[in-house]
UniProtKB/Swiss-Prot annotation:
Protein name, per record: Small ribosomal subunit protein uS9
Superkingdom of the organism of origin: Bacteria
GO MF terms, alphabetically ordered: RNA binding; structural constituent of ribosome
HAMAP family for this protein: Ribosomal_uS9_B
Entry's family note: Belongs to the universal ribosomal protein uS9 family.
GO terms of biological process kind: translation
Biased composition (Basic residues): 111-130
Any one cellular-component term (Gene Ontology): cytosolic small ribosomal subunit
Organism of origin: Lacticaseibacillus paracasei (strain ATCC 334 / BCRC 17002 / CCUG 31169 / CIP 107868 / KCTC 3260 / NRRL B-441) (Lactobacillus paracasei)
Upper taxonomic lineage: Bacteria, Bacillati, Bacillota, Bacilli, Lactobacillales
InterPro entries assigned: Ribosomal_Su5_D2-typ_SF, Ribosomal_uS9, Ribosomal_uS9_bac/plastid, Ribosomal_uS9_CS, Ribsml_uS5_D2-typ_fold_subgr
Key words, A-Z: Ribonucleoprotein, Ribosomal protein
Region (Disordered): 98-130
One Pfam family of this chain: Ribosomal_S9
């Protein structure tokens, strides 16, 4: 018998996370590793599991995440976005609280490109008057 799965895709910075929710005990697996082994900072892990707290579904689903691109912060944000979208497929009534908390909004902030004539995106070489 096929197991019930709920899917969602999340994005943040240059990261894309494909999230699957499976009814279970609340175990989170990112790229085949436990989330505590994969992400180095505790605040990223708590940030990542916020949608479950908002919808009061903590410990109801196992999370399987396939994420690539970006760094740890972007990957955690993409996973959070994906979990929120997947929870919408579980129950459409979650839309109100998730939207109010800003979980469904794709964060548009991206790395600004480097401009020629400058050292970085906005950093210029020191100005000399004489």
């Amino acid at each position: 018998m096929a197991q019930v799965q709920y899917a969602g895709t999340g994005r943040r910075k240059n990261s894309v996370a494909r999230v699957r929710l499976v009814p279970g005990t609340g175990k989170i697996t990112m790229n085949g590793k436990d989330v505590r082994d994969y992400l180095p900072y505790e605040n990223l892990i708590t940030d990542l599991s916020q949608p479950f707290g908002i919808t009061e579904t903590t410990g109801s689903y196992d999370v399987l995440v396939n994420v690539n691109g970006g760094g740890f912060s972007g990957q955690a944000g993409a996973t959070r976005h994906g979990i929120a979208r997947a929870l919408l497929t579980v129950d459409p009534d979650f839309r109100g609280p998730l939207k109010k908390a800003g979980m469904l909004t794709r964060d548009p902030r991206m790395k600004e490109r480097k401009k020629y004539g400058l050292k970085k995106a906005r950093k210029a070489s020191q100005f000399s008057k004489r």
